[in-house]
Swiss-Prot record:
Keywords for this protein: Aminoacyl-tRNA synthetase, ATP-binding, Cytoplasm, Ligase, Nucleotide-binding, Protein biosynthesis
Quaternary assembly: Homodimer.
Protein name: Histidine--tRNA ligase
Gene Ontology biological-process annotations: histidyl-tRNA aminoacylation
CDD domains found in the cross-reference section: HisRS-like_core, HisRS_anticodon
Amino acid sequence: MITGIKGFNDILPGEVERWQHIEATARRVFGLYGYAEIRVPILEKTELFCRSIGDTTDIVEKEMYSFVDKGENAVTMRPEGTASVMRAYIEHKLYAQDPVAKLYYMGPMFRYERPQKGRYRQFHQIGAEVTGVTDPKVDAQVLTMLCHFFAELGLTEPTLQINSLGCPECRPVYREALKSFLRERLDRLCDDCKRRYETNPLRALDCKSAHCKEATADAPAMLDHLCAGCDDHFAATRRHLERAGTPYSINNRMVRGLDYYTRTTFELVTGLLGAQSAVAAGGRYDGLIADLDGPAVPGIGFAMGVERVALLLGQQEFARRPDLFIAALGTEAQDEAFRLMCGLQRLGVSVEMDYEGKSLKSQMRRSDKFNSRFTLIIGSDEMASGRATLKAMDTGTQSDVLLDPTAIAGQVK
């Protein structure tokens, strides 16, 4: 038997409906805030992610699915969505159409990681991006929209944590302060953090190693090294969050795993998923578009893991109930049931029937399995009279109905 690849999961009926609910909620909520959907390719030039995410990140160093294609091009299956969306934004000159672009995306991403609960090698993200505005009100609105989405799903447990990573003016000062702190603790860091000490010391704050977490527990905070502009921006973002009624807490150790973030960074975290506590995360990336050879346009965005959101929804039932199940006894009744089913489906009624000529008892068990809203039984008497009894399964109420698609649709829709 050929099985699926480790970390690449099938999403089966019963679970798909949960995903569709998440996606539909995102489309509805994001639409309220003026976002339009964009769809970008799964495969991109490897250079895109090296330049955007950062050469010294875990994603680029260890996790990307990269290969050289038959045309000798170095390509990568996208590990995240922001870089691809910004590449499309630049390539198609969306900045010339409107100074402010609001975009969202959905789709699979790929990283070679150790599969575990809520983390897979093919995983799915829903993300949103805003370009063209540095005003901290936009930061607050993006965060408010994200929290609004989770509230619409009925999920109040994930909590918002925010931080500021400063800008190219103040981050070098913090970088030196952090290097000075780490210099006395290098022997306690993991090999990766030792190697990155010179090139990217901030990665030590994001390291998953227990030794590194312990060694950096009292590390200096970026918030204590912000320049006046970044300090004002972070303070204004917090004020606007409070005006919007969006609760938050400050996590001054948050650095995220992507090098392009500046100023506001954030996560929605939960204690319900074990070690995989972040269900959504993002931040501001005011230099990314210029770094990718686009104009000097600021941006901010986020992505959420659909698998993790689905886990938070638990065992809620999202499978759609058929409107009607038709139980038919005998060949002529089955033919009539098929005619009615086709006519009803054209009228927008969801219908199921038995195709195997089973007993009435067996067909009623199948109706129960489908959890249909109504059941219609057709036998020889019903064929002779042209009428049948329609039963509402939730209430037990019965009504007499003509064996006609329009008449039945009027009763069940």
